[in-house]
């Protein structure tokens, strides 16, 4: 995966200052035509941003620049290898800073292919026994459900008639577990309804019962600033998982 960062140039405008057509000009491939069944070529309207978002032209330019000095990460002492390794490590720090944990030695950024692989890594590393219990919810993407089913016992928090998480039920299950639930894995925002969970409130509840919180932020990162430290220690997010290709990163 690639995280591209750049400083604003003098000629750049802030996104809030752009008109509708200027927004379109930021992205690559927006005007690429595709064929219909009858052979006619049209410019499609994309509604699949929840799966993959279009890329910025500036990201494309940065990617092309990176290819000029592309080498093996941490595999040599040549200039290209060292340059690529530095870019790789810089990206890690950029991610940590973005979530306000850049100066906290308790956090690190781990690269994987996508959210599903991240969840599988966590499920296989954190869980030591099939009898361990993880608490998740009925609003999860399969990426935050199936990995736990394969590695441990899973319990679910229900949602109400409006699709909102039953916070009281979550706390009740944690309390009744008497410390047996070590991890609570929840979505930051539902990929079906768009409902945004109060992750810091949930984190506080989890820590009250000595459980750690894992947040699937695949559908949240692009739409809301996330401070993993919270406003106080009990609100900290222990693990945050997301995929750059689902979001608009520049």
Question: In which residue ranges do the predicted regions lie?
Answer:
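Pyridoxal 5′-phosphate
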Residues: 1-250
């Amino acid at each position: 995966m690639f995280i591209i960062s750049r400083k604003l140039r003098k000629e750049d405008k802030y996104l809030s200052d752009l008109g509708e057509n200027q927004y379109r000009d930021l992205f690559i491939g927006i005007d690429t035509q595709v064929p219909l069944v009858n052979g006619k070529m049209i410019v499609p309207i994309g509604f699949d941003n929840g799966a993959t978002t279009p890329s910025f032209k500036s990201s494309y330019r940065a990617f092309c620049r990176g290819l000029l000095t592309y080498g093996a990460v941490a595999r040599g002492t040549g200039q290209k290898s060292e340059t690529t390794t530095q870019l790789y490590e810089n990206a890690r720090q950029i991610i940590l800073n973005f979530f306000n944990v850049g100066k906290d030695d308790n956090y690190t950024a781990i690269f994987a292919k996508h959210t599903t692989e991240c969840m599988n890594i966590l499920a296989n590393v954190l869980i030591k026994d099939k009898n361990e219990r993880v608490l998740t919810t009925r609003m999860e993407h399969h990426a935050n459900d199936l990995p736990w089913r394969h590695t441990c016992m899973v319990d679910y928090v229900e949602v109400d008639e409006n699709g909102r998480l039953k916070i009281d039920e979550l706390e009740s299950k944690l309390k009744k577990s008497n410390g047996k639930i070590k991890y609570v894995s929840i979505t930051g925002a539902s990929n079906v309804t768009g409902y945004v969970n109060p992750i810091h409130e949930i984190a506080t509840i989890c820590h009250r019962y000595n459980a750690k919180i894992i947040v699937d932020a695949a559908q949240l990162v692009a739409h809301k600033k996330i401070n993993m430290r919270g406003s106080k220690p009990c609100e900290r997010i222990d693990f945050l998982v997301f995929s750059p290709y689902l979001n608009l990163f520049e």
